[in-house]
Amino acid sequence: VTWRSAPGTTRLTLETPVRAVFSTDFSSVKYRGYVFAPELALERSGLGLPRSRARIGLGPVFASGGLMDYWYRVEERYSRPGRPAYDAASGYLGLRLQFSYRVPLTERISVSAGGRLENFSGASNAGSPLFRSELNATLVGGLSFALYRSPAQTGSAAEPFD
């Protein structure tokens, strides 16, 4: 679901992604479960620098029982003093705030920066001995480069966010 401002410089979106989660030890791949992370996001183009795009989003995160087991379950055979057996449950994982800022430097090169703040207070598995912290912060930076651009291009009436 998306709302756009009249001049097309701002949009508000509600995203409802469901993602499958897999792990690998490079000899096999295993399905671990899924994550449902709805997010309400505000995006703005041309904020600060021409052609830039700023985005901030907020939403809860929920995970399946299989995925929660992968992260938080402690089987009886691995329990020890200070780390009792624990059977994880599906449900609320936490609240996520994400933000990013992207600036195209040329037609082929863009620079971006962003981050994520996560609050796991009230998570369904906060009682697990493997649950370490209620807060998590991540910062990222990146440089993207288009290796090839087709000389055949079509006209487009797309908005800056498309």
Tell me what each language-model feature is.
Residues 6-14, 47-50, 108-111, 148-154:
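Repeated loop/turn-to-beta-strand initiation elements of outer-membrane beta-barrel proteins
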Residues 13, 35-37, 138:
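Broad gene-expression machinery/nucleic-acid interaction feature
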Residues 25-112, 116-125, 130, 161:
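Outer-membrane beta-barrel transmembrane domain signature
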Residues 13-19, 55-61, 114-116, 142, ...:
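Transmembrane beta-strands of outer-membrane beta-barrel proteins
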Residues 2-4, 19-21, 41-45, 98-102, ...:
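Transmembrane beta-barrel domains of outer membrane proteins
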Residues 1-4, 84-89, 139:
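Short N-terminal helix-initiation segments at or just after the protein's N-terminus
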Residues 134-162:
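Outer-membrane beta-barrel "beta-signal"
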Residues 1-28, 133:
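Internal, conserved structured core segments that host functional sites
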